[in-house]
Amino acid sequence: MKNFILSNNEARLVVLQRIELISPFLKKLRKFFGRTLFTNFVTKYFLNSNQIGISYYAAMHKEFLTFQNSINSDQDQLFLSIGGGLGGLELIINQNLPSKKYYFIERNFISKKVKYGWGGTINNEAYNDLEIQKRFLENNGMHNSQINIFDYDKDKLPDQKFD
């Protein structure tokens, strides 16, 4: 697999989480129309989900290569992802080290206006939908028994040691 299979809704969430994956034309549209219109209109109707799937896969694979040698394939069994988006990086890990368990802690809403960065301020923004995330993981090869998703604002968070 050299790309992720993305529905339009999944591609939208990927773009809201990783703006660098959009085309130069969409970057110009975003700059011209502003973040609110881009978030609520352009990302719903003008994304190429196939191209986003290719770009997202490449970005996650490149990231995986930076720490691949730090994972012990025999000992590391439980992976924790906090605010990791849809889980593309975890899918790459799963392709290379199958049969692990993944725990995702995410917020479950999509902000009206995208705000990127940290800048020392409290960031109450979120760009995820946990049902869409689960469907994305399953459609791209992660088995349901490997997936544990927690809503940061509503669920009791996991209390165990992670690898």
Where is each model-derived feature located?
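Conserved class I S-adenosyl-L-methionine
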Residues: 75-85, 103-106
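N-terminal cationic-hydrophobic initiation segments that often serve targeting/anchoring roles
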Residues: 71-72, 94, 102
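Conserved SAM-binding loop of SAM-dependent methyltransferases across substrates and taxa
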Residues: 86-99, 115-116
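Class I S-adenosyl-L-methionine-dependent methyltransferase module
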Residues: 101-142
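Class I SAM-dependent methyltransferase Rossmann-like catalytic core
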Residues: 2-74
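Conserved SAM-binding strand-loop segment of SAM-dependent methyltransferases
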Residues: 142-153
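A short acidic, Gly/Pro-enriched loop at the edge of an enzyme's catalytic core
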Residues: 152-163
